[in-house]
């Protein structure tokens, strides 16, 4: 199965709030005036971040959720994500379950997958997330103060 057929069959969904979404060499987005773009990336490696026999839909959900959590921690609204995935093989059943979990989480939080990359290799998933936050309103680690609540 080719990279383009994997993208078309499992990851090509309508994109919200983009000027150009998935399917080209790059996506185009516009950030509203008065906002900043927040960007974060997390990688999940089979055998390190999840057991090799973990259900694919759970892996997809987790890949999106850990990134959305980073946006929330900064006070940003998650909007867009790009997915890079290395697969040992293009298993249609696994890809169907993985993409179902990924998009279930994405849709719950209003995130559009706007691009990415696929290649052959040991199972590795890297998701980059982008969001918006009103200018100079980011909640940074350096802004924490004695008495602030910490959630985990």
Pin down the residues of each PLM region.
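Extreme N-terminal cap/leader segments of soluble proteins
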Residues: 1-55, 74, 79, 83, ...
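A generic alpha-helix structural signal
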Residues: 8-11, 68, 99
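Glycine-rich anion/phosphate-binding loops
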Residues: 18-20, 52-66, 90-104
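Surface-exposed loop/turn and secondary-structure junction residues enriched for glycine/proline
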Residues: 23-25, 31-32, 46-54, 62, ...
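Glycine-rich anion-binding loops of enzyme active sites
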Residues: 37, 44, 77-152
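A short, N-terminal amphipathic alpha-helix
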Residues: 63-74, 105, 109
């Amino acid at each position: 199965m080719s990279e383009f057929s994997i993208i078309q069959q499992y990851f090509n969904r309508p994109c919200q709030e983009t000027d150009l979404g998935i399917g080209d060499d790059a996506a185009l987005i516009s950030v509203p005036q008065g906002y900043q773009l927040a960007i974060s990336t997390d990688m999940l490696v089979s055998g390190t971040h999840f057991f090799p026999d973990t259900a694919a839909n759970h892996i997809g959900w987790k890949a999106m959720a850990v990134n959305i959590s980073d946006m929330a921690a900064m006070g940003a609204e998650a909007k867009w994500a790009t997915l890079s995935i290395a697969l040992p093989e293009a298993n249609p059943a696994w890809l169907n379950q993985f993409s179902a979990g990924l998009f279930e989480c994405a849709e719950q939080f209003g995130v559009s997958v706007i691009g990415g990359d696929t290649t052959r290799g040991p199972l590795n998933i890297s998701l980059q997330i982008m969001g918006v936050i009103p200018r100079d309103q980011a909640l940074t680690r350096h802004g924490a103060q004695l008495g602030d609540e910490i959630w985990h």
